[in-house]
């Protein structure tokens, strides 16, 4: 089955066809390291983490490059506010980013280049553009001639003539055209700078990714990714620079993930709804955040709310509870016939095929997770129907299906914990917020068992209701009565 990926450049889904067979070269725009990362950064990191994991699951070799912008106007401004150097500030927040990523359980990219370590590569491209009359120096700055690239606007779908007609006359008299953008910025007092043929200065933002992607992936590579907010002007300008300098296509496929809102509002510090990754992980297990993010296909908008996170937690707990229950099954009797129906067996035998069909359709994690959740329902139903001495065929089917589900869930970073430990830690965390202890719950359960043994159904129901009021749900099964906390975080 071919993987079909939505390409922003063409505006349609296309088969993924790596330039080098079975080797995908991927470049993703990383953070500007001046502050703590927020949930939007988490979505970006997790989306491309999922893509890399899935491609490797399919036995593709993946070279994954994600950069750090460690010199920028925002970094300089924040450094001046806090009284530290731009380098020290950038390094601090790169370290914070790595901590966040480790806590989220993301794979490290193969290469994580920093802009400040690739100044010469940027100067080289700028010089190539100047030599081609596609860029010009002006008072220590260097600007890209937008009109020199006829295809400008092909990624964002913007018409350069319309943009120029709507542009105000540039306040910057050093520009020939208001649409021209900076490749190199002349140094200012107190700012970091590097020597160049045009005098001391620092690179513009857009040239950084053109230089780093060319160094590590070549002039033409497979996939360039980022958020939809980067399509224009950042990625549009990258194409103009790179294709102008190299004379060949830049990235063949452009992947852009959707925005994250908070209760249907754009996230912003002024609205007081700015959620950092640290904030979220203080309240939720990282796999809950993953289950939430992957409940929506990566290109679609994603709205963060406590209710949505509770739904994600409920789904994740069901996965872990099922994993735990199946792991406890005995081997079974090889002489007994299977009880699982042919219909359910066929569904379980097709889990991987249906999961791949979903993922091959532009990495549709929402549909892929739906396949796993549906399989869990079948497994739970089949497990409840097992006798005290189950058929070995049924046990083999259930254990094999659960092992496969755990493997596939790992592609989106779920079911990575020991099931018993995950469920126990969750119980302890949830109990810390309500007025009952685990020992008291177990005491109530024993009282209820005694009542049921004496056929005192009224007392049995009364105990269940008492526990429900305290946020405890009982679950009767073949192995006894279990319980879970149903109150929200």
UniProtKB/Swiss-Prot annotation:
Its cofactor is Zn(2+). Its EC number is 6.1.1.16. Zn(2+) binds at residues 29, 209, 234, 238. Disulfide bonds: none annotated. A motif ('HIGH' region) lies at residues 31-41. InterPro entries: Cys-tRNA-ligase (IPR015803), Cys-tRNA-synt_Ia_DALR (IPR015273), Cys-tRNA/MSH_ligase (IPR024909), Rossmann-like_a/b/a_fold (IPR014729), tRNA-synt_1_cat_dom (IPR032678), tRNAsynth_Ia_anticodon-bd (IPR009080). It catalyses: tRNA(Cys) + L-cysteine + ATP = L-cysteinyl-tRNA(Cys) + AMP + diphosphate. ATP binds at residue 269. It holds the Pfam family tRNA-synt_1e. GO terms for cellular component: cytosol. CDD domains: Anticodon_Ia_Cys, CysRS_core. One of its GO terms (biological process) is cysteinyl-tRNA aminoacylation. Keywords: Aminoacyl-tRNA synthetase, ATP-binding, Cytoplasm, Ligase, Metal-binding, Nucleotide-binding, Protein biosynthesis, Zinc. One of its GO terms (molecular function) is zinc ion binding. Binds 1 zinc ion per subunit. The keyword Ligase applies. A motif ('KMSKS' region) lies at residues 266-270. It is found in: Cytoplasm. PANTHER family: CYSTEINE--TRNA LIGASE, CYTOPLASMIC, CYSTEINYL-TRNA SYNTHETASE. Belongs to the class-I aminoacyl-tRNA synthetase family. Monomer. This is Cysteine--tRNA ligase. It comes from Desulfotalea psychrophila (strain LSv54 / DSM 12343).
